[in-house]
Amino acid sequence: MKRYILATVIASLVAAPAMALAAGNNILSVHILDQQTGKPAPGVEVVLEQKKDNGWTQLNTGHTDQDGRIKALWPEKAAAPGDYRVIFKTGQYFESKKLDTFFPEIPVEFHISKTNEHYHVPLLLSQYGYSTYRGS
């Protein structure tokens, strides 16, 4: 019985970090708000890429939910310090609303130095402008 309890405790300690990551401790999230409507921008494709010596490598992709968010954009692999970018594919979003836009894609480059922190990239969007910052 003692061995069973010990094995259960050890298994839960090993599985806890993976379960925590899957449960919402992903290090990267994004949020898009449409400044023209004051509402979230659902259905926007967002691509995560890592800078390598010879260019950019795609790590993950997702679409914003009804609240304009992707809560877990980091792939299921350990984070590493380095340069990354998220590319917001906004052209399709405006096309679906039958609106023109000057920015069909918005690449936002950022640097990860501490892999134990959370990085949030909000995008405030309109047809002819945008702003972004490191959120929380």
UniProtKB/Swiss-Prot annotation:
Catalyzed chemical reaction(s): 5-hydroxyisourate + H2O = 5-hydroxy-2-oxo-4-ureido-2,5-dihydro-1H-imidazole-5-carboxylate + H(+)
Residue sites binding substrate per the record: 31, 69, 133
GO cellular component: periplasmic space
Major localization listed first in the record, in broad terms: periplasm
The keyword Zinc-finger is assigned to this record: no
Signal peptide: 1-20
EC number, as in UniProt: 3.5.2.17
SMART domains linked to this entry: TR_THY
Broad EC category: hydrolase
Pfam entry (one): Transthyretin
Miscellaneous section: HIU hydrolysis also occurs spontaneously, but more slowly.
Cited function: Catalyzes the hydrolysis of 5-hydroxyisourate (HIU) to 2-oxo-4-hydroxy-4-carboxy-5-ureidoimidazoline (OHCU).
Protein name: 5-hydroxyisourate hydrolase
